[in-house]
Regions:
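H-loop/switch region of ABC-family ATPase nucleotide-binding domains
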Residues: 187-188
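Catalytic Walker B motif of ABC-type/P-loop ATPase nucleotide-binding domains
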Residues: 152-155
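Conserved ABC ATPase "signature" region
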Residues: 108-123
């Protein structure tokens, strides 16, 4: 499923958080949305998911204007890990099952199948507070996968986890891409993980660069985005 963002602006807290952002993603693609903290990455993902109103511009899915109903049917947003109360006394299976309540419609993926897909089948009965950071991120991804969505919006899924966990998560995302899903993944990491993506969008309130990881590195050179050196 294709996703088209055209000249989108979003206001947050009375200020314009992002402005004039345009790009188009095709089905079966894995795209990184990279920028420093405060660049508007989460704001853009939430706007695409229909959780924030647009100040300007438009969003389309497969050529159809995005409505809240369409967003709920075809989009799934994975929140940042810090937004979840991991001390809450429920199991991994129960957390993932909550994704079916968010979707609230037929066609949801089986919880056990989603857990197996992210490599957490053996941990289904484990309590949330017993998970490592990487396991928490995979549990959130599984919760996203039980929703019948064709476009996945993942907010900082690789943040604050160790390299082996990041590698495992990137492998899962690659498998989802290969299965035909469209993934847009936010990150503030300019490291070698970018090479796992088909395409990179660099955002700092506006879109600064768009291309393959190699093209973006060449285009930006030594440019600083926020406090990060891109070269």
């Amino acid at each position: 499923m294709s996703l088209a963002v055209e000249q989108v602006g979003v206001r947050r807290g009375g200020e314009l958080a992002i402005e004039a952002v345009s790009f188009e993603l095709q089905g079966g693609s894995l795209t990184a949305l990279v920028g420093p903290n405060g660049a508007g990455k989460s704001t853009l993902l939430q706007a695409i998911a229909g959780q924030l109103p647009l100040e300007s511009g438009s969003i389309q899915l497969d050529g159809r204007p995005l409505t809240l109903t369409l967003a709920r049917r075809q989009l799934a947003l994975m929140p940042q890990r810090g937004e979840i109360a991991w001390a809450f006394p429920i199991t991994v299976r129960e957390l993932v099952g909550l994704g079916r309540l968010v979707a609230a419609r037929p066609g949801c993926c089986d919880v056990e199948a989603a857990l197996q897909r992210v490599g957490l089948g053996a941990l289904a009965k484990r309590r949330l507070d017993q998970l490592s950071g990487g396991q928490q991120q995979r549990a959130l991804l599984a919760r996203t996968l039980v929703q019948p969505a064709q476009v996945l919006l993942l907010d900082e899924p690789c943040a604050a986890i160790d390299p082996p966990a990041r590698t495992a998560l990137l492998q899962v995302m690659g498998q989802l891409r290969d299965a035909g899903l469209t993934l847009l993944v936010s990150s503030h990491d300019w490291g070698h993980d970018l090479d796992a993506y088909d395409r990179v969008l660099v955002l700092d309130r506006q879109l600064l660069a768009d291309g393959t990881p190699q093209q973006v590195r060449r285009a930006l050179g030594d440019l600083r985005v926020g406090n990060h050196r891109c070269g």
